[in-house]
Amino acid sequence: MISLITYFGVVHYNFYRRHVSLRSLYIILISMWTFSLAIAIPLGLYEAASNSQGPIKCDLSYCGKVVEWITFSIACISLAITASLTGFAVISLHWYNYKSKTNGVDVPKVTTRARIRLTWTFFALIVICLIELLPFGLVIGNDKSSLQGCDSFYNANELLVQSIISSVETLVGSLVFLTDPLINIFFDKNISKMVKLQLTLGKWFIALYRFLFQMTNIFENCSTHYSFEKNLQKCVNASNPCQLLQKMNTAHSLMIWMGFYIPSAMCFLAVLVDTYCLLVTISILKSLKKQSRKQYIFVVVRLSAAILIALCIIIIQSTYFIDIPFRDTFAFFAVLFIIYDFSILSLLGSFTGVAMMTYFGVMRPLVYRDKFTLKTIYIIAFAIVLFSVCVAIPFGLFQAADEIDGPIKCDSESCELIVKWLLFCIACLILMGCTGTLLFVTVSLHWHSYKSKKMGNVSSSAFNHGKSRLTWTTTILVILCCVELIPTGLLAAFGKSESISDDCYDFYNANSLIFPAIVSSLETFLGSITFLLDPIINFSFDKRISKVFSSQMKFLRSKVFCASSSSLSRNDKIIKDQSQIE
């Protein structure tokens, strides 16, 4: 229609002005849509029936081929008629332009634009004919369009050509349909004017927006921009916002790498190692006699607590950097902190229990044999768990109240300060008590070993393993005291928070955020390293667990080597058979 209207409007202007009215164009347009729907509806239904089952039955062997050929024939006729009419109009316009130039008549710019636009339309139509008719005709001509299921697999060698044809058809068609409106709009005078007007208005709107909001965009002149700066646009009282933004980004980077990514990976590995050691310990515990089970009761408590601590560290650090569910609820933080405090206290109790068991087993063997029965050990372990629950619940509730608003209100600075120092003092007492007990037992064992060597007595391997394991446990506890008490005490003394928020207070004090970020990140980083190394080093000194681990490694090694050797022998046999055949 565009080609015919352009033809009559340029070559036969009087006919176009008298007979081609707006009403007649609407009638022709409605007729085209009606004719297209009348053909498209039945063809579309039969094409759908040939591709999937439905109310209309059309098998692929006969009906599908008939539908394909009918569709192909109608497409050929329609495209041929359209291409012929458009080609006739293009040739006529070019001939009209040539005659006008020969006669010395100036051709209007509107006519030149229409001729160029119609030439592009004709070129696009030729391309569409090629990409629609040739590939489709080749596919149905070779009878490969209905290959499905096993037929596609059996004729896989012939599917490559079909795939290339279909892909090229889609790619070239998409390029044509993308380029067509752009070139057509470019040669249309009215649409080009409207596009230029809209671009000009857009530039004015952008300039007006920058003018109105340049006072609030405090980071506009900064050389480096960060994702979190949009939350700090309201902090307009900063004297040097770019420098504060860089300081805050440094603190964020420290917290997210040394306080989240690396510790989370180490804690995840620690969970895997602790779980493996826990399963091995439980299997060993079931096979031991009552007298030998006593030393592994606290080991089970220790491993269970270490698993919970590592998981809590991952979740707690995730709340500061990831939008996890329930992170804005008091109950979530309360449960999380209660489990974390319970696990820490249970771990400290298991440390103390192992130390006392080792001390009485070496220094007071009769007391250990007669007084410390298996029932007594279970009672002590239950008492440790009960004490941990009783202390962890108020601890966790007040820690959650300090983190987020909830049923327990602690909004004033005096309340927060009192709660922080109270929790810090109680944690100091518990940690120092456990550390003192372990130091006493460790020093006693080393003194006993020194006296035995001086008297010429040879210490047993079990005693040496126990002494080494207890020395490592004491070292772990000292490190825990350092990473738990020193950073918390320093931050509480200087009135700093362990987390960094995107509010204006932290932004205005960004120069002093580096210190709490380093302290908090080191606390989490060293703690994660400790919880990863603890089970590995501890159970390398345990004879029974080391034996189980060694036997499992030997079993896996034998299985792997047997499988590889059998596969190699099988390959050698195949090669020999092939050589004999040749």
Curated annotation (Swiss-Prot):
Cellular location of this protein?
Answer: Cell membrane
Single GO MF descriptor: G protein-coupled receptor activity
Q: What name goes with this protein? A: Putative G-protein coupled receptor B0244.10
Top-level taxon of origin = Eukaryota
PROSITE patterns given in the database record? G_PROTEIN_RECEP_F1_2
- Residues annotated as glycosylated are N190, N221, N237, N457, N538
Ordered alphabetically, the record's keywords are: Cell membrane, G-protein coupled receptor, Glycoprotein, Membrane, Receptor, Transducer, Transmembrane, Transmembrane helix
Matches recorded under InterPro entries: GPCR_Rhodpsn_7TM (IPR017452), Put_GPCR_Chromadorea (IPR040435)
**Organism classification:** Eukaryota, Metazoa, Ecdysozoa, Nematoda, Chromadorea
Name the species this protein comes from. Caenorhabditis elegans
Q: Which GO terms describe its cellular component?
A: plasma membrane
Indicate how the chain sits in the lipid bilayer. Multi-pass membrane protein
Assigned protein family:
Belongs to the G-protein coupled receptor 1 family. B0244 subfamily.
- Entry keyword annotation includes Transmembrane helix: yes
Segments spanning the bilayer are 25-45, 70-90, 120-140, 159-179, 199-218, 253-273, 296-316, 329-349, 377-397, 421-441, 475-495, 513-533
Q: Does the keyword NADP apply?
A: no
